[in-house]
Amino acid sequence: MSGETTRLTEPQLRELAARGAAELDGATATDMLRWTDETFGDIGGAGGGVSGHRGWTTCNYVVASNMADAVLVDLAAKVRPGVPVIFLDTGYHFVETIGTRDAIESVYDVRVLNVTPEHTVAEQDELLGKDLFARNPHECCRLRKVVPLGKTLRGYSAWVTGLRRVDAPTRANAPLVSFDETFKLVKVNPLAAWTDQDVQEYIADNDVLVNPLVREGYPSIGCAPCTAKPAEGADPRSGRWQGLAKTECGLHAS
């Protein structure tokens, strides 16, 4: 891919975020994605264009997916065929998650951008010692998730996430649209108001791909060493970083 990235200035992005928050209060997920596409879909993009399976699309926003399911991917692809979808390949994912990523790229009209850290797991072990995730999980997440994502998002004016308010107490007030103070771009959360029932109904009605681990009792899926099955009825994210003073990986700090 070739070409120059076109990204709006921070004042422009802040203004658009405020406008979107006002205009989209109570909007459906599809309406939010349409607004995102109308606002950011044709003003330049990473590398001057992203190749979709069935053609080329120029897009100045990106969708992020942890590959737990393809609900957001399905919604976004219907609005913008060929939309770029970021997957943070930390090197620690379950085999099932990698398989879901590959299946999603095959089934949906999207382009999966496989984003990797600067160092492989083996290189990180050599530099910082084995199993950094157990000794300093915040630093491990920073190196393998936050930094790589930040570098990738520099090429875009907005990112779309699957963040939901019911996921955890830390996400209870997640806005639909905001300016992301961490990555300095517009952040859109089309599923923020969705309940678990909303997700399940959409999956059933649209035959959406789901990570096999979800069926096995993992409602929140991250890196394999830091993900366990939560107790029945517990916070869905309580299986993440069990025994550690950590509840978020740092991607959704703002």
Swiss-Prot record:
GO terms for biological process: cysteine biosynthetic process; hydrogen sulfide biosynthetic process; sulfate assimilation, phosphoadenylyl sulfate reduction by phosphoadenylyl-sulfate reductase (thioredoxin). It comes from Mycobacterium tuberculosis (strain ATCC 25618 / H37Rv). AMP binds at A64, L88, G162. GO terms for cellular component: cytosol; plasma membrane. This is Adenosine 5'-phosphosulfate reductase. It is found in: Cytoplasm. It is an enzyme of class 1 (oxidoreductase). The gene is cysH. Was identified as a high-confidence drug target. Inhibitors that target the Fe-S cluster have been developed and studied.
